[in-house]
């Protein structure tokens, strides 16, 4: 969805309900309405085909995505809740995707009828739900990336944290996302324009542009820079480990890192075009041709919903990584699931050799950690007493 009332790159529901009432060039929805043929005029065959295609595609994405995310929620809560301390983040991601996908029926209905049928409350809820779930997803991914970074490079810090801190972080991501969404939730209103209804914010074009720019910074630019920095440092640590002269064990945490990074990259691939389109519409003076604007709006809309549709496949791989690792710990004889020597900083390795057990056994929370059993000659820790995913 998009929220650009002064441009044709608008939220699909908004683009579908433009009014035929003439408006002055500076009005918020003047260029918006120009992106569609007047609702009083018969639709062309091309419009009918495009509407049918986009409606069918979004409906298919909705069915696949809802089933996939519901399956992820069930599997994660049943299989990992008692043993995997990071399960709450997977639940967060799947829940955000599920809520976002549940808006598809409203969007398809608006595309087909070119009329808003869901009242003032629908305007506020559906527009704000879009930004709420988007921010909840990227904030959760940022927290997960930070956790992986800390588990690999600062393992002792992870075992000293209280048991419920991850639940507090998960709740915090939703509260912060809600805080950023409140302005649009309060400002959206249903406005009558002739025979049609239109969802518009109460603020002016400048405030709207500033708000969208802020949301771009909080959902793409800021988290992107932070996650990029974390993974750059992790990549450097792994490169250093490749030069270390000791036998390395198989590290399930490396696979988990790649899966989390894959989810992050998929988010960027699907939402960056959407945001570039939104900002282009805000800062570009000359509007695109209505047909071009409509096509771009279709494509960016499908990309954002496609992200929530594809994510469950990566979530399944992530939870499977948890289960495989836990199964390996149970089957491993002897010292609590030790699978081989894993590099660490030398002082930490000496501590473990003296104690004869994993540092994670001192943690008050259940974890899925490996034992750091051998000292590296140099370089940062590459496995941690943290979780494998």
UniProtKB/Swiss-Prot annotation:
| Broad class of the protein's primary localization | membrane
Q: Which residues lie on this side of the membrane: Cytoplasmic?
A: 78-87, 147-167, 233-258, 319-389
Give the family per the record. Belongs to the G-protein coupled receptor 1 family.
Which BP terms does GO give this entry? blood vessel diameter maintenance; neuropeptide signaling pathway; regulation of blood pressure
Q: Name a single GO cellular component.
A: plasma membrane
In this protein, the residues bearing a glycan are: 29, 33
Which residue ranges does the record annotate as region Disordered?
1-39, 328-366
Which InterPro entries did the record assign? GPCR_Rhodpsn, GPCR_Rhodpsn_7TM, Urot_II_rcpt
Q: Which UniProt keywords apply?
A: Cell membrane, Disulfide bond, G-protein coupled receptor, Glycoprotein, Membrane, Receptor, Transducer, Transmembrane, Transmembrane helix
Protein's recorded name: Urotensin-2 receptor
Q: Which residues cross the membrane?
A: 55-77, 88-113, 125-146, 168-186, 210-232, 259-284, 298-318
**Topology of the protein relative to the lipid bilayer:** Multi-pass membrane protein
Superkingdom classification of source: Eukaryota
Disulfide bond as UniProt keyword: yes
Q: What does this protein do?
A: High affinity receptor for urotensin-2 and urotensin-2B. The activity of this receptor is mediated by a G-protein that activate a phosphatidylinositol-calcium second messenger system.
Tell me the CDD domains matching this sequence.
7tmA_UII-R
Q: Which residues lie on this side of the membrane: Extracellular?
A: 1-54, 114-124, 187-209, 285-297
Q: Biased composition, Polar residues: where in the chain?
A: 1-10, 28-39, 355-366
PANTHER family, per the entry = G-PROTEIN COUPLED RECEPTOR, UROTENSIN-2 RECEPTOR
Which Pfam families does this chain map to? 7tm_1
Where is this protein localized, as stated in its record? Cell membrane
Instruction: Cite a single GO MF annotation.
Output: urotensin II receptor activity
